[in-house]
């Protein structure tokens, strides 16, 4: 299995280095749910600004403040502790008057707004995230500048970031041990993390192999293509390749790669043979996913950061802004720009 740092680059390995997350203010994330609170209902949506706090810690503190069980507070996604983040938490408080959440006090946190909502906020129920990153001590400005220009046109590999695999790859290692021993795993969180790491690693491997081809975005017979921004896909046939290639070039369609699991992967013929060959050596992880009935799915092979802009503060410091859809990783954008240094270079966003 290829480690994250050794995965194939779309724009070639960066020529320079830079410091990511010199301080939390250098990594700002604003969650975009894609909808507004209903204004009524048994739940309360709370938008919180956090600095130096992880999501679960804040959720538990909010539950304690509201005198409800911790399981009654949910969120759409985990956000990094070592960053400045805005995100929504959701508390189920039925049949009660609206509490004064401006009185909620927690070091590093500030309540920005809150309102009633009809439905629970579930994991993954967000549109995306807006990022503002500051890269410092950049050693090669010209290389980073050209890469930013190229990313606007060609995007980046839609890899799952190193954080998906746990500190030091612990989640992937856990999945491998589980696959090899067949010992039941009772802990629901471990099961979820390990299965997710296994499937993500196989996806990354398939994409890394595809990126070694001369024309990465060339549609081949049997490719599974996805309408940009949609979840469903269809299979490309030889007769349609020219027309479909035009739509891929226009970014109307996206070539996808497999998230292996039980059931059909989605590709056929030449494309399916390629994907199967790319992960042929990873029989244990594939068997684990089938055994645990993790359903196969698809994910876009490339990621196009939206609203991408940048501003050089000086020759060694650049501020970069962009928006990514839910499930995408900012660190997978950064790895195409610089070789990152710093204690938190691979920590989750």
From Swiss-Prot:
GO terms for cellular component: cytosol. One of its GO terms (biological process) is tRNA pseudouridine synthesis. Keywords: Isomerase, tRNA processing. It catalyses: uridine(13) in tRNA = pseudouridine(13) in tRNA. CDD domains: PseudoU_synth_EcTruD (cd02575). PROSITE patterns: TRUD, UPF0024. GO terms for molecular function: RNA binding; tRNA pseudouridine(13) synthase activity. InterPro entries: PsdUridine_synth_cat_dom_sf (IPR020103), PsdUridine_synth_TruD (IPR001656), PsdUridine_synth_TruD_CS (IPR020119), PsdUridine_synth_TruD_insert (IPR011760), TruD_catalytic (IPR042214), TruD_insert_sf (IPR043165), TruD_pseudoU_synthase (IPR050170). The active site is at 80 (nucleophile). Coiled coil: none annotated. Substrate binds at residues 27, 129, 329. Its EC number is 5.4.99.27. It comes from the Bacteria. It holds the Pfam family TruD. Residues 155-303 form the TRUD domain. Gene3D superfamilies: TruD, catalytic domain (3.30.2350.20), TruD, insertion domain (3.30.2340.10). Responsible for synthesis of pseudouridine from uracil-13 in transfer RNAs. Belongs to the pseudouridine synthase TruD family. This is tRNA pseudouridine synthase D. The lineage of its organism: Bacteria, Pseudomonadati, Pseudomonadota, Gammaproteobacteria, Enterobacterales.
């Amino acid at each position: 299995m290829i480690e994250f740092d050794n995965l194939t680059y779309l724009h070639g390995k960066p020529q320079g280095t830079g410091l990511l997350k010199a301080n939390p203010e250098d990594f700002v994330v604003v969650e975009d749910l894609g909808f507004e609170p209903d204004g009524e209902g048994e739940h309360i949506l709370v938008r919180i600004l956090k600095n130096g706090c992880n999501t679960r810690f804040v959720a538990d503190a909010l539950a304690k403040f509201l005198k409800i069980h911790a399981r009654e507070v949910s969120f759409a996604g985990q956000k990094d502790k070592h960053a400045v983040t805005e995100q929504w938490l959701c508390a189920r408080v039925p049949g009660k008057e609206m509490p004064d959440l401006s009185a909620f006090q927690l070091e590093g946190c500030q309540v920005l707004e809150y309102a009633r909502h009809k439905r629970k906020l579930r994991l993954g129920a967000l549109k995306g995230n807006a990022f503002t990153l500051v890269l410092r001590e950049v050693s090669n400005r010209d290389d980073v500048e050209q890469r930013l220009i190229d990313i606007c046109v060609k995007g980046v590999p839609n890899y799952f970031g190193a954080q998906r695999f746990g500190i030091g790859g612990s989640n992937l290692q856990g999945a491998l041990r589980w696959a090899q021993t067949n010992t039941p795993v009772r802990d629901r969180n471990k099961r979820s993390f390990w299965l997710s790491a296994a499937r993500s690693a196989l996806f990354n491997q398939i994409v890394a192999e595809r990126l070694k081809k001369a024309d990465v975005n060339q549609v081949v017979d049997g490719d599974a293509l996805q309408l940009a921004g949609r979840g469903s896909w269809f299979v490309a046939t030889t007769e349609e390749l020219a027309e479909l290639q035009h739509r891929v070039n226009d970014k109307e369609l996206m070539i996808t790669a497999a998230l292996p699991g039980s059931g059909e992967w989605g590709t056929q013929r030449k494309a399916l043979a390629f994907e199967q060959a790319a992960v042929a050596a990873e029989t244990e992880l594939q068997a684990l996913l089938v055994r645990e009935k993790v359903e196969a799915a698809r994910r876009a092979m490339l990621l196009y950061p939206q609203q991408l802009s940048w501003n050089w503060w000086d020759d060694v410091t650049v501020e970069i802004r962009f928006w990514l859809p839910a499930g995408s990783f900012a660190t997978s954008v950064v790895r195409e720009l610089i070789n990152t240094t710093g204690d938190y270079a691979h920590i989750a966003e």
